[in-house]
Amino acid sequence: MLNSKEFVRELQLRHESAWMNPNVGSAETALAALPLTRADVDAAEARLERFAPFIKKVFPETAADRGLIESPLTEIEHMRAWLNENKGAQLAGKLFLKRDSDLPVAGSVKARGGCYAVLKHTEDLALANRLVEMRDDYSVFATRAFRDFFSQYELHVGSTGNLGLSIGIMGAALGYRVTVHMSADARQWKKDLLRAKGVAVLEYGADYSYAVQKGRERAAEDPRSYFIDDENSVDLFLGYAVAARRLKAQLAEQNIAVDEEHPLLVYIPCGVGGAPGGICFGLKQEFGDAAHVYFAEPVEAPCMLLGLASGLQNAICVQDIGLTGRTAADGLAVSRPSGFVGETVKAIVSGGFTVSDEHLFTDLHALHETERLFVEPSACAGFAGAVELSKMTDYLESSGLGAHWENAAHIVWATGGALVPEGEREKYLAN
């Protein structure tokens, strides 16, 4: 295993590498030291339940889940066999895909945090203006009167693509004026889709951090504008954290035990950190020390792992060590991590891995061939973590995971893909 200094050197060399967090401690102790609590996740979960009648009405594809924005958990045994045979993996137990790539409304994990942040702001405005009480039927938010009210307000967000889609789609459905500030990495089809929904898209020839800053500045000019801050938002974070509770129920439905003798290993693609950080926080709340969460980042944009391993959090960016921040995994093309997320997860995330663009496409193609499932390149990052961890015999032994490896449940969190147009899918699969 590499120490943190050696790992940063591997990052500089653009090597696919692994970092195991030396600061991870007992979940109970680590969670007790954090300002966010189970009560915060309770409140977020309850708010999503209150808005479910509205979501069901406006987004009929959510009807099967009663207006909840949720995705399937699918065992991918053929992909597990492929990884073992073709990549030298030693994955025992079961391998699952958490298909946030197929989440309704926005087709990515950002439908969790992004939609929740919009709904939280919406409820705050509605309560302050006495439009509703919490016990009311929130399907009234779909009426013309409510849409007219929210049309007085504007939402701003900086995005590489998927967060902009979730906030743009949900914001427009509620009647807001929405402006998405897009970095140079954003895919054209995502901009086109937003504009088709009536969302204003401002394009910048610079990276994600610059787009976020521009969004922050624009929102500050108007008291009726609200900036959804991907770098610092507690609301986004809590929206993602709710996912862990839903996952717990899905695992129980499939008779998957999670405890010390049946460890849960979760591999999550990471950009600025909000989605993986929130999910990690939720998983540790639900499963404690039985959950082991690993972040996966591109070799050119490993911002969160760089911040965690160096201890500098958002005081360092990938360009500081000679990397470009450019990657085909557009959702992960972030150069500087969230300091808020880094501080929150520094004692609960188990580690992380970096992956080359080449291997993202290899795994994208293999998943489609073996399971007939399509995800976008960013969503494939977790496979590299599962493969690499399975080969780290010293770490597995020292961490105690090796003793229960045969009983492990592995979850690769697929973060996006459902909205990718057919022409783009064909290009990805041909790459």
Regions found by a protein language model. Give the residues of each.
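PLP-dependent amino-acid enzyme catalytic core
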Residues: 1-431
